[in-house]
């Protein structure tokens, strides 16, 4: 496995691979890898001849007062996990190369970025789509893999790819959870032991909603109250949003069906966690 930091070098490798008829898969990450990331890499290996994982804590998707400076970083461990998962190249560019002093071009998906995480994180998705578009141009992947834990992000990237006619197949992969149900996240490392227990209110409330839905409840108001009641019992939990949305276009819904996605953002102590559940999926 190689570590590439130079953009020009990465582009040259990708162009040569394509010229030789190789399929390229890309797994974009911000590092501090866990088994959720590894699952994307294992799937990427099945779908391509050259598997590239990017590791880049992207400054343009963090807002003022967010955790860019404190975001966990561990390149040595990341390289171990990536290599074990079958990654051929790690692309870890420097921020100064990705965004030089005279940088002024951004990609913005308009409507899908307004609700959910976009409502309280202005500019976040503009940063996400810009860096992903840059990675697509640099790595030239045939396929790119993203986790469904960031459900809105996946929808936004799919919209960007469709709107801009990017020749990339975007694959969404299921959420990988800890044994007790907590969705794997690099930010879980911020949690104290007590907060780690409290954080289970996210997955537990999603499971409760799924159970109620399977028993016939279709009222979004009733299902939402179930989530709110469960999370509000945790003293260190502060709800950012609890939303029921159409699974494809993220439009708000009043009546739940199998395509409805329940999306949560909750602060546990100082740590903002997200999770989601599509009601029609096991």
From Swiss-Prot:
Keywords (A to Z) from UniProt: ATP-binding, Cytoplasm, Ligase, Nucleotide-binding, Pantothenate biosynthesis
Location in the cell: Cytoplasm
Main localization of the protein described in the UniProt heading: cytoplasm
Binding site for (R)-pantoate: 61, 153
Annotated active site: 37
Pathway(s) the chain acts in: Cofactor biosynthesis; (R)-pantothenate biosynthesis; (R)-pantothenate from (R)-pantoate and beta-alanine: step 1/1
Residues the entry annotates as binding ATP: 30-37, 147-150, 176, 184-187
Transmembrane parts of this sequence: none
One term of GO molecular function: pantoate-beta-alanine ligase activity
Cellular component per GO, a single term: cytosol
Residue numbers binding beta-alanine: 61
GO BP of this protein: pantothenate biosynthetic process
Subunit structure, as described in the record: Homodimer.
Job description of the protein: Catalyzes the condensation of pantoate with beta-alanine in an ATP-dependent reaction via a pantoyl-adenylate intermediate.
Entry's family note: Belongs to the pantothenate synthetase family.
Miscellaneous: The reaction proceeds by a bi uni uni bi ping pong mechanism.
Protein name per its UniProtKB record: Pantothenate synthetase
Native source species: Geotalea daltonii (strain DSM 22248 / JCM 15807 / FRC-32)
């Amino acid at each position: 496995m190689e570590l590439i930091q130079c953009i020009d070098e990465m582009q040259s490798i990708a162009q040569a691979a394509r010229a030789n008829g190789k399929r390229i898969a890309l797994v974009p990450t911000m590092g501090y890898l866990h088994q959720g990331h590894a699952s994307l890499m294992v799937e990427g290996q099945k779908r391509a001849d050259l598997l590239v994982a990017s590791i880049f804590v992207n400054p343009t998707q963090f807002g003022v007062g967010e955790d860019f400076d404190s975001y966990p970083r561990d390149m040595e461990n990341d390289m171990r996990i990536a290599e074990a998962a079958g990654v051929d190249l790690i692309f870890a560019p420097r921020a100064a190369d990705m965004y030089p002093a005279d940088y002024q071009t951004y990609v913005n998906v308009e409507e899908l970025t307004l609700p959910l995480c976009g409502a309280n994180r202005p500019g976040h998705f503009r940063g996400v789509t810009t860096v992903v578009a840059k990675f697509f141009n640099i790595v030239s992947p045939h396929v790119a893999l993203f986790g469904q834990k960031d459900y809105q992000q996946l929808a936004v990237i799919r919209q960007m790819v469709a709107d801009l006619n990017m020749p990339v197949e975007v694959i969404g992969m299921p959420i990988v959870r800890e044994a007790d149900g907590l969705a794997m996240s690099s930010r879980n490392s911020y949690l104290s032991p007590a907060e780690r227990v409290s954080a289970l209110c996210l997955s537990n409330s999603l499971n409760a909603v799924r159970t109620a839905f399977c028993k016939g409840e279709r009222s979004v108001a009733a299902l939402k109250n179930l989530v709110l009641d469960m999370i509000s019992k945790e003293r260190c939990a502060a709800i950012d949003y609890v939303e029921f949305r159409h699974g494809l276009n993220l439009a708000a819904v009043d009546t739940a069906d199998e395509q409805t996605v329940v999306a949560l953002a909750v602060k546990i102590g100082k740590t903002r966690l997200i999770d989601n559940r599509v009601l029609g999926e096991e």
